[in-house]
Amino acid sequence: MKFFIDTANLEEIKKANELGILAGVTTNPSLVAKENVPFHDRLREITSIVSGSVSAEVISTDAEGMIEEGEELAKIAPNITIKVPMTKEGLKAVKVFSEKGIKTNVTLIFTANQALLAARAGATYVSPFLGRLDDIGHNGFELISTIADIFNIHGIDTEIIAASIRHPLHVTEAALRGAHIATVPYKVLMQLFNHPLTDQGIEKFLADWNRQK
């Protein structure tokens, strides 16, 4: 499973990229709004740092508007992926983008049927939301398993991005259930590195080494 970072913050992206584990970035209008910078300018900055997929979301609700926005976003850099909501209008736009060779990430996926429809429309990625399903008492892990099974049975190449990740367990389970990618907030990404026994082990090794010098 690959790691994307879910942020529009440049410092977080730079720090994650330096770790050598980052395969891409996902953004959304809420994340970009927090940064208080022009959307296109921030995307140019991100794509200058990260060579992998950078998801940029359209805000139009009709297919024509999404296509117009998406085509402009795609001009920013070759690694821009157009993020489109899981709606009928969204999938109309996905079909057009697919025919033009523009990569897409269909977001706000909450059922396997939605994922299958998005894949058949030509989506490069689908993004089921784990945390938001948890919030309403549904099992997001089972959803990822089901989507992965369906895609495997039918030979579908669309990749599954586990999104709305809130804690390290979400990452582990997403990997076990067949997600190709986890898009993770910076805070959660940093938590993945930590375990008390790792810290204790390093301290002991250093103490032993210093004693014998």
From Swiss-Prot:
GO annotation terms (biological process): carbohydrate metabolic process; pentose-phosphate shunt
UniProt function note: Transaldolase is important for the balance of metabolites in the pentose-phosphate pathway.
The name this protein goes by in its record: Probable transaldolase
Swiss-Prot/TrEMBL catalytic activity: D-sedoheptulose 7-phosphate + D-glyceraldehyde 3-phosphate = D-erythrose 4-phosphate + beta-D-fructose 6-phosphate
Localization of this protein: Cytoplasm
Pfam families in alphabetical order: TAL_FSA (PF00923)
EC number: 2.2.1.2
Transmembrane segments: none
Recorded family membership: Belongs to the transaldolase family. Type 3B subfamily.
Lineage: Bacteria, Bacillati, Bacillota, Bacilli, Bacillales
Enzyme class: transferase
Gene Ontology cellular component terms for the protein in this record: cytoplasm
Positions of the catalytic residues: 83
CDD domains associated with the record: Transaldolase_FSA
